[in-house]
Amino acid sequence: MRSGLRIAVGIATAGRPLILAETLVELASQTRLPEAFFVCPAAATDFDASQASQLPFPVHVVKGSRGLPAQRNAIIDAALDFDILMFFDDDFVPAPSYLAEVENCFAAHASVVVATGRLLADGIIGPGIDFAAARATLASYELPKTESPLVNRYNAYGCNMAVRVAPVRANGLRFDENLPLYGWAEDVDFCRQLAIYGRIVENARMTGVHLGVKGGRTSGIRFGYSQIANPYYLWRKGTTRPGGALRQVVRNVGSNVLKSIWPEPWIDRRGRAFGNALGFADLLRGRLHPKRILELK
């Protein structure tokens, strides 16, 4: 039985129209379909509008400035009349029961304001995962029968993040557009804004696979700079713990420096290490800021 909650799905996308098209085929296979789908493409060519008529739910194309936070904000502005806004990355493959589990979670737990799912595989930490492998992984997984599938988390993982819209609407909450382009840690900042209004949880029954597609992402130098600038900015802003920010910086810089000797083919480690160095240099000069990546290549 439906709870009466109205769910919208939102995807901000850039440079991956074929991936998005296949992701939408998976979304159309949900056992519980969304009331609406909002897509914010960075460019007109990033979404094939002809696909909209083939999908079993209303499709709305919204316009926003290029960059994940800005595009997601455009989606929020368009979806404020819904109860739950489900953010997916354009390369996230949800299990067929995903949205049904989202509805169950938010209907049963009024204190939950953000829920993220359990990743069965994440291509970000490797060369990437294709759709066939993602489907096979999902098909072979048995959902846990535990009565308490929720675990409290500091933040959700932005590739699959369900948000209760009421506190967002009531308090004018938005993603921070000072974190440009790919965003990087924008999910942490947004979740910590919401944390004062309720629980942030991981739900073991909301499952999916993040393909980790490499195309359409930020350059290594820019990404490396963001690995320094964004944690520092969020620490100064007060939406991340200083210890957590420091551990994140140390871990990322260490990985980039050590692995730049024999880098993985799918990661520009040397570019990232150079971006890290630029970030530290700007910190010493007193001009470290996330938006500086717009001046880098």
What are the roles of these predicted feature ranges?
Residues 222-230, 240-297:
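Non-catalytic, C-terminal membrane-associated alpha-helical segments of glycosyltransferases
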Residues 24-63:
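Acidic donor-binding segment of Leloir-type glycosyltransferases
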